[in-house]
A protein has these predicted regions:
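C-terminal amphipathic alpha-helix
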Residues: 2-67, 97-154
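Extracellular/lumenal glycan-associated context and N-glycosylation machinery
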Residues: 69, 73-77
Length: 154
């Protein structure tokens, strides 16, 4: 059961992480394009009004996050987070032979939560947002792969 829960953790974090990654990339693109007045067929509906770029990137981000599709994505990410939280609760206090697995799972969980948080509620400057996004995105893949290597076959 413990190995099955670990495998479920890996599956859910990579699935949710992939959705969060797409949302973070779009957020970063909207943010950047507003500041640097870059036209783009994907972001123009958020970055411009009446053919003119918004003076404040927060206006653009507010338009992005007010969109129905974004609300659906955010809702899905929050549901994913609740599911992963439950899996992590099941994995606490591992048997001794799974201690290293649990450490990797905990690191995977931290990266996953960081990525979800950035996707759901962007904050900071474009620079810090981009740096945090890169770190969590890289860490998610690193610990996903590490956990795979540590999981013994059932």
């Amino acid at each position: 059961a413990y190995i099955a829960s670990r495998n479920e953790l890996r599956a859910q974090t990579i699935r949710g992480g992939s959705v969060a990654e797409k949302m973070c990339n779009l957020t970063k693109q909207v943010w950047y394009n507003t500041i640097y007045e870059e036209r783009d067929s994907i972001t123009d509906k958020y970055t411009r009004s009446g053919g003119v770029f918004h003076d404040d990137f927060n206006t653009s981000l507010s338009l992005l996050y007010a969109e129905d599709n974004t609300a659906t994505v955010i809702s899905g990410l929050q549901a994913s987070r609740e599911l992963v939280d439950g899996i992590m609760a099941d994995l606490q206090n591992p048997p001794a032979e799974f201690a290293a697995c649990y450490e990797a799972a905990d690191s995977l969980y931290d990266a996953y939560c960081g990525l979800i948080d950035l996707a759901v509620s962007p904050s900071g400057s474009l620079k810090t947002y981009s740096e945090n996004f890169s770190k969590y995105d890289e860490d998610l893949l690193k610990y996903y792969n590490k956990l795979e290597a540590l999981i013994p076959s059932e």
